[in-house]
Regions:
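Membrane-embedded helical hairpins/re-entrant loop segments and their flanking transmembrane helices
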Residues: 5-15, 37-58, 240-279
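Flexible hinge motifs at transmembrane-helix junctions and intramembrane kinks/re-entrant loops
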Residues: 38-43, 152-155, 165-224, 231-254
Length: 279
């Protein structure tokens, strides 16, 4: 166990706060950016929406739940299909339909209570659903960890394994601040190993040319209704994505259960499941 622990509302020292912030950024970055890349949407839009969504969730839940709102893997297949057939307008409409389902269930919970949810979705049901969502993307993780320039590379696998084991070792045996930021330290080890391996083999594993060429500040490529496209109702998008909201809702219940265990609180009661769903 780590010697350094902070409660939900505790404020770490400035140095540790910066380290934890960067670790959280890198931890969420991969998943949040991967979904729009797989779907064909500008990742900057996902990051911007994710930030607004997190702030909205924190506000609605009265800053009591330490949660981040990122991209959902459950919608990938549906969004990919809609992007090919009807475009971004249909995807946006389907996402809004999913949000309305959340609000509807939140209203039901507010006035009817949550006991019915406990009966329909006990932990033994919620757990496997979360596992399936994660394992369904295992192929993407393996592919990213073993390919370089879209082809298999033993060097990519080696770098991935070094990074993975570094994170595991820091997490299991790190003391104090080292054990608190294992992901950040694992990334540093991975980048350092990549640079050294590149020098030894003559291969270039690190390329910052696109970063150097990118603008420091740039507005995401938003697609605005009535400006970039004409409004049209997409029943197929609504019927496709609205039901998936119940899948991600189950995932949400699991996340809250885990947070309850980690923080030794009951967020189903305070601020309440209706608030977490609305957020």
């Amino acid at each position: 166990m780590n010697d350094v622990k902070y409660d939900v509302n505790d404020m770490p020292k400035p140095g540790l706060l910066v380290g934890l912030s960067f670790q959280h950024l890198f931890a969420m970055f991969g998943a949040t950016v991967l979904v729009p890349i797989l779907v064909g949407i500008d990742p900057a839009i996902a990051l911007f929406s994710s930030g607004l969504g997190t702030l909205a969730h924190l506000t609605v839940t009265k800053y009591k739940i330490p949660a981040y709102m990122g991209s959902s893997f459950a919608y990938i297949a549906a969004m990919q299909t809609l992007m090919k057939t009807d475009g971004i307008a249909a995807v946006a409409q389907g996402a809004m339909a999913g949000g309305l389902v959340y609000l509807l269930v939140a209203l039901i919970v507010k006035y009817a209570g949550k006991d019915w949810i406990d009966k329909v979705l006990p932990p033994i049901v919620v757990g496997p659903i979360i596992m399936v969502i994660g394992l369904n993307l295992a192929a993407n993780a393996v592919n990213d960890a073993t390919t370089l320039n879209k082809s298999y590379s033993i060097y990519a696998l080696l770098i991935s394994m070094v990074t993975l084991f570094a994170v595991i070792l820091f997490n299991m045996y790190g003391k104090k601040i080292v054990g608190v930021v294992p992901i950040l330290l694992g990334l540093i080890v991975g980048y350092t190993f990549s640079a050294v391996l590149g020098l030894l083999t003559g291969h270039s594993f690190i390329n910052f040319s696109e970063v150097a060429a990118a603008h420091w500040i740039q507005v995401p490529n938003f697609d605005i209704p009535f400006v970039d496209y004409s409004f049209k109702l997409y029943p197929s998008a609504i019927l496709t994505m609205a039901p998936i909201a119940f899948v991600t809702m189950t995932e949400h219940f699991g996340h809250v259960m885990v947070l309850n265990s980690l923080t030794e609180r009951d967020y189903f009661k305070d601020p309440g499941l209706d608030h977490t769903l609305t957020g």
